[in-house]
């Protein structure tokens, strides 16, 4: 077969009515005693291969007929157009070579429980639905980077191991670090992005983030990917404007590049895109509580707005909303205190509808040296561990703001999924560390 070009399912248009070789895996097979239809997976795409006894002969046809799911093969034949095919083409087989057998593949076409599928995640990735989800994830990742690069943001690779607490000390993964005491898996790259704005003005990072939250909800992972951005000379209002434009732009681009995959997922993106045609309402935390009380919720100032209450608010406003100016005691030390109400901070969470919940958290940062020391002391955090961070407030400090968005919740929203565990290749949850 070496004299015939070996092609990918991504390059089929160039080889219509030509002899080609396609290498891949048997995704499925069906047919009769005269012909078999193989779904051949290559490059994450499925190509239909037609195997006819009249062309192949009895012996080869019987080999084809008894192929098992996930057997790897090299198939030669003529590529023809077929508008009924998901990729628009079909391969008429004239030769086949088995590369690797597949015995007793555990994920058969029948229904399986989610616990079993998660335990077989290394194999479950091959299913049509999971193929589509991970392509959407890839498209989102591309759209995120494109958005920031087109607006002159610089990518900063922030450390995974850190000696500083970025969010809550109660959600840290800790490990001994030689003779230097404890190191922590990063909860955020934000503190390091703040250092970088003094060199580059507009920066972002995109990578894994770790939270040791003892939560088993459908919205939580202990390891997830977060994109974070930080901008010098930007206030709270600037930050909200950037976040809204970012979310609308990357969702639209991701959807446009994922239409076939969303079709596989039976996700109609029309309602999602409709949300993006309106401005996102901005309401104060205090106003949110007033609305919830009118709906019969027993909630007092200082209480958390849980996921159920978040969804009540998105339903009230008919789409995504920003909730801003949360109680100071409930938020991180680096958030700037609201000068109009010192009990609150200049922050906001973007809440997505459809059961998704918070997808962005952002704030204006405290730029004053004395104020941030007071906040560290309020949080009972060791000031000496933040010497380098405090230096940023001593040498040319400026107003600045930023935000972080969790990729998996965004993917769940775009794909219409009920759980974030399917939105990352190998999910890490409180009860799951394998495979």
UniProtKB/Swiss-Prot annotation:
Reactions that this protein is recorded to catalyse: tRNA(Asn) + L-asparagine + ATP = L-asparaginyl-tRNA(Asn) + AMP + diphosphate + H(+)
Gene Ontology MF term list: asparagine-tRNA ligase activity; ATP binding; nucleic acid binding
Recorded superkingdom: Bacteria
Subcellular compartments: Cytoplasm
UniProt keyword Coiled coil, yes or no: no
Keyword entries, A-Z: Aminoacyl-tRNA synthetase, ATP-binding, Cytoplasm, Ligase, Nucleotide-binding, Protein biosynthesis
Keyword Disulfide bond: no
UniProt GO BP: asparaginyl-tRNA aminoacylation
Cellular component annotations (GO), alphabetically ordered: cytoplasm
CDD domains: AsnRS_cyto_like_N, AsxRS_core
E.C. designation(s): 6.1.1.22
Primary residence: cytoplasm
Family note: Belongs to the class-II aminoacyl-tRNA synthetase family.
Complexes and interactors: Homodimer.
Protein name per its UniProtKB record: Asparagine--tRNA ligase
Name of the gene: asnS
